[in-house]
Design a protein with these regions (language model features):
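N-terminal secretory signal peptides that target proteins for export/translocation
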Residues: 1-16
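Sec-dependent N-terminal signal peptides
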Residues: 18-27
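Boundary at the C-terminal end of the N-terminal hydrophobic targeting segment
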Residues: 33-35
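Active-site histidine-anchored catalytic micro-motif
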Residues: 38-39, 51, 62-69, 79-86, ...
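Anionic-ligand-binding alpha/beta catalytic cores of soluble enzymes and soluble regulatory domains
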Residues: 159-241
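A conserved acidic, glycine/proline-rich C-terminal tail/linker
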Residues: 226-299
């Protein structure tokens, strides 16, 4: 090797080392973001009766067979964006920082709705259509940054003519590349304002001697009704176990249920088929029938249009 060649090799090595140093410095100071734990978690409304979920995971494995793939659920009711939003809020906080979550409930697939990756202040990355799915996670974990997916580079090869399966061709592909370290968060696409499309709902708040809140979800296996009222807010009413809670449930402005329910630690403290108010595993106020289905019995569902008011009846 000539002296000139040695000099060129040395210069190239210095440039590579310099680029590596710059990359590490930017990474250390949070100027670029890499999802490092190789975990991708999926949720969809696809169900498991066909091969759609398998296709999404196959795309991820093709990006990197080292990825670890998990599921939240694929049984979100069809087109139910609100339920997708709730399941994210329910579960994401239990996954380690750096996890990539791919959420696909996308009735507007192929239209002008944006495809984004939201980085939460907790360090999670949510890949999703910006259609309301991010409503609750943006509030609970906070928005660090939002980037629009640049499909000119972050789309599965030769998939441009397919306009109805972005879950496979865009979201799973981009999420896998991010989780595998093939791309940084900055390489997802252009930075957007730190806002997302939000579904309106009643946030939990104290209003005089009442607390107003929302019914974001049902404990669907058992028909328990979950609210977004945290135990700490409920405690401001100074409830006592065994005493009654006055509950009024609305669908839009229509009153669906009114009743006084005993506040209990757990289900077995009341007789079978009797109602109770309790704090659920997410530390939020909930309502149930012991060994029964509260939601079905009283025709209650969940979503942004469902609200609740609670108070403590005055003792005589």
């Amino acid at each position: 090797m000539s002296g000139k060649s040695i000099i060129l090799v040395s210069q190239n090595m210095k440039k590579k080392h310099l680029r590596l140093i710059i990359f590490l410095v930017l990474l250390a100071y949070g100027r670029i973001s890499v999802a490092q734990n190789k975990i991708v978690v999926y949720q969809t409304d696809f169900g498991l009766k066909d091969g759609a979920v398998s296709e999404m995971k196959g795309v991820a494995m093709e990006v990197s067979p080292d990825l670890k793939l998990f599921d939240i659920t694929h049984e979100i009711p069809a087109y139910n964006i609100w339920d997708a939003a709730y399941r994210l809020e329910q579960t994401v906080k239990y996954w380690p920082a750096g996890t990539v979550i791919v959420s696909v409930v996308d009735p507007g697939v192929g239209t002008s709705r944006k495809s984004v990756v939201l980085k939460t202040k907790s360090g999670h990355f949510i890949v999703s259509p910006d259609n309301g799915t991010l409503t609750l996670i943006a509030k609970s974990l906070g928005i660090a940054e939002v980037r629009e997916i640049d499909e000119s580079v972050n789309r599965r090869k030769d998939s441009q003519r397919s306009n109805t399966f972005h879950g496979r061709d865009v979201y799973s592909y981009t999420g896998a590349r991010l989780a595998a370290g093939v791309i940084t968060f900055e390489q997802v696409g252009p930075l957007l304002p730190p806002t997302v499309v939000s579904i309106p709902f009643q946030q939990a708040k104290l209003d005089g001697k009442k607390i107003k809140g929302n019914i974001p979800a049902l404990d669907v296996q058992y028909g328990n009704v979950w609210t977004n009222i945290p135990d700490t807010l409920f405690d401001q009413l100074k409830p006592k176990y065994g005493n009654s809670v006055h509950v009024v449930i609305f669908h839009n402005s229509e009153k669906v249920y009114t009743g006084d329910i005993p506040y209990s630690r757990t289900f077995g403290e009341v007789a079978d088929k009797q109602p109770l108010a309790y704090i659920n595993s997410l530390l939020q106020l909930s309502f149930a029938l012991n060994m029964g289905d509260f939601a079905k019995t009283y025709h209650i569902s969940s979503g942004g249009e469902w609200s609740v008011e609670i108070s403590i009846p005055e003792t005589k």
